[in-house]
Amino acid sequence: MVFTQRSFIYTIWDSAIQNSSMNGLAEVTGPVVIMGVAGCGKSSFAAALTHALGWQLIEGDDYHPPENVNKMRAGIPLTDEDRAGWLVVLAQALVQHGPQAVLTCSALKKSYRDSLRRGVPDLRFVHLELTREQSIARVSQRPGHYFQPTLVDSQFAALEKPVNEAGVLTVDATLPIETIQAQVCAWLQAKECV
């Protein structure tokens, strides 16, 4: 059997689910945005979460227009104007996919999160947090990805941490995936998370 990174994550995730309580998650609805700077594990965690819950995955990077991808590939940071149309499209995708969807999106600024919330009131966010050094190390290990390590500093410059922001859970992105899973699932079940 050939293991890809994603199938390895699913194997770990399934094991974690078998060893933990998922009671009550059948009633949980989203949608939920997995946010954070490049390299924090948005795609890996969102894929594992959607697999565990049976929800749909919306990979935000897949919705970037070619102009945005070309800029990032060239090492040019995106501007608010570059992201504006992309965020509208992501909000539309959330509406189309319904309440059982997980979106990956950096959502670095509060205005970006608010743009998504305009399309989906009471939208919840899981902020996977890590340091600049950890981000650079992780992004450097993604050969072939259009996001260049030189862009990490621009992400941290743009980041407005969602401190005391309603509907946001911040989690240490360096924790084991089963620990993140336990924190997120407990939060999703709590009435005060929305």
Predicted regions span which residues?
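Glycine-rich phosphate-binding loop used to anchor ATP phosphates in small-molecule kinases
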Residues: 81-120, 128
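Conserved lysine of the Walker
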Residues: 42
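Conserved substrate/cofactor phosphate-moiety recognition/catalytic segment
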Residues: 47-89
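Conserved phosphate-donor/acceptor-positioning beta-strand/loop module used by diverse small-molecule
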Residues: 120-138
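Hydrophobic anchor at the beta1->P-loop junction of P-loop NTPases
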Residues: 34
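Extreme N-terminal, non-catalytic leader segments
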Residues: 2-29
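P-loop (Walker A) phosphate-binding loop of NTP-binding proteins
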Residues: 37
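Small-molecule kinase domains that catalyze NTP-dependent phosphoryl transfer to phosphate-bearing small molecules
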Residues: 141-185
